Amino acid sequence: MVDFPFAYLVGVDGGGTSCRARICDLFGNILGEAKTGSANILLGGEIAMASIQQAIALAAQQAQLTTADYPNMAVGLALAGAEQQQAWHAFMQQPHPYGAITLNTDAYGACLGAWGGKDGAILISGTGSCGILLLDGQQHVVGGREFPISDQGSGAIMGLRLIQQVLLSVDGIVPSTELAQHVLTHFDNDIDAIVSWSKTARPCDYGQFSPAIFTFATQNDSLAVSLLQQTAADIEMWMQALILRGASSICLMGGIGERIQAWLTPPMQQRIAIPQGDAMDGAIVMARGNHNLFVR
């Protein structure tokens, strides 16, 4: 790469559960990859930096590189929590051994990866949900304000609605279904256990029921079908918001996004594009510079 002062590009995709690092040469050839623990900077900037450095060290080992090569690395960080300005600045003030680092959100990295570094839109629907459009140098974000106040169209919200319907079925207000019985069996038919569980349940705890919802929907379980219809409507709401901001096609990503497509209306199905790459690919693009979310 002409006039680029570093020898290696490093892409890091960091979320609440894992941190993945990929080292490439300037031609995009992958030299090493590794995965470590959480790198959500809202859960602790120092913890995130430790996970990142560990992942890069493991990837470097695979690439037969040493710490002496670190100053020749330009690192692109696509991290959960980077949208919070105070957390962004606190993280960027930490010392590091690399030649340069660039920090933006995991959604931004995923969007860059999905569209090969060019303008485009994605809707991530996994445990949570978030839509992002990159257009003419601007970043447009819809949703993504986390569970339970946002994240419509996600596994967590779908799981929350499931639990609510199960409790209504116990009270005889709505019909019970095989899916409702499946959930009750999970809790040993103990309503108090569901209530106690709910006091500390995290988004991923609600999201754990998503596979069962899809499975029972194939058996025409009325509760499962209604939950997927509602989730599909939520996803179409986010897609429409991105379209109004200028998106023409949208990549659906995440565990729910990849499975919900058949439940969308035909006009929205026609808007769906296939991602060209993932968030690590986007982070590699970020490593080349000019992708910081805020100004240092």
Cite the ranges covered by each PLM segment:
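Glycine-rich beta-strand-to-loop/alpha-helix junction loops that act as flexible
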Residues: 76-82, 125-127, 247-257
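Short hydrophobic/aromatic-enriched beta-strand-loop microsegments
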Residues: 101, 124, 141-142, 270-277
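Short beta-strand-loop/turn "lid" adjacent to the catalytic site in phosphate-handling enzymes
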Residues: 40, 56-103, 115, 199
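Glycine/charged-rich beta-loop-alpha catalytic/anionic-binding loops adjacent to active sites
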Residues: 34, 95-96, 139-146, 264-271
